[in-house]
Amino acid sequence: MAHENVWFSHPRKYGKGSRQCAHTGRRLGLIRKYGLNISRQSFREYANDIGFVKYR
């Protein structure tokens, strides 16, 4: 069994490995609240476009 066949062969149907950012594909720093599913870096970039307003 070659390395290419073994790498990422385990099914990721649940947990942190199964979710990724809708914009960048990153798996770290994911905001799932309200069904956003975007990374926090992408959220800072697209927050105004989505409709979030900064009050302070």
UniProtKB/Swiss-Prot annotation:
Any GO molecular function: structural constituent of ribosome
UniProt keywords, alphabetically: Cytoplasm, Nucleus, Ribonucleoprotein, Ribosomal protein
GO CC annotation: cytosol; cytosolic small ribosomal subunit; nucleus
Entry keyword Lipid metabolism: no
Primary site of residence: cytoplasm
Subcellular location: Cytoplasm; Nucleus
Domain of life: Eukaryota
InterPro entries registered for this protein in UniProt: Ribosomal_uS14, RIbosomal_uS14_euk_arc, Ribosomal_uS14_sf
Gene Ontology biological process terms, A to Z: cytoplasmic translation
Keyword Repeat attributed: no
Disulfide bonds: none
Transmembrane segments: none
Ranges in coiled-coil conformation: none
Function: Component of the ribosome, a large ribonucleoprotein complex responsible for the synthesis of proteins in the cell. The small ribosomal subunit (SSU) binds messenger RNAs (mRNAs) and translates the encoded message by selecting cognate aminoacyl-transfer RNA (tRNA) molecules. The large subunit (LSU) contains the ribosomal catalytic site termed the peptidyl transferase center (PTC), which catalyzes the formation of peptide bonds, thereby polymerizing the amino acids delivered by tRNAs into a polypeptide chain.
Family recorded in the similarity comment: Belongs to the universal ribosomal protein uS14 family.
Quaternary organization: Component of the small ribosomal subunit (SSU). Mature yeast ribosomes consist of a small (40S) and a large (60S) subunit. The 40S small subunit contains 1 molecule of ribosomal RNA (18S rRNA) and at least 33 different proteins. The large 60S subunit contains 3 rRNA molecules (25S, 5.8S and 5S rRNA) and at least 46 different proteins.
Designated name of the protein: Small ribosomal subunit protein uS14
Organism whose genome encodes this protein: Schizosaccharomyces pombe (strain 972 / ATCC 24843)
Top-level taxonomy: Eukaryota, Fungi, Dikarya, Ascomycota, Taphrinomycotina
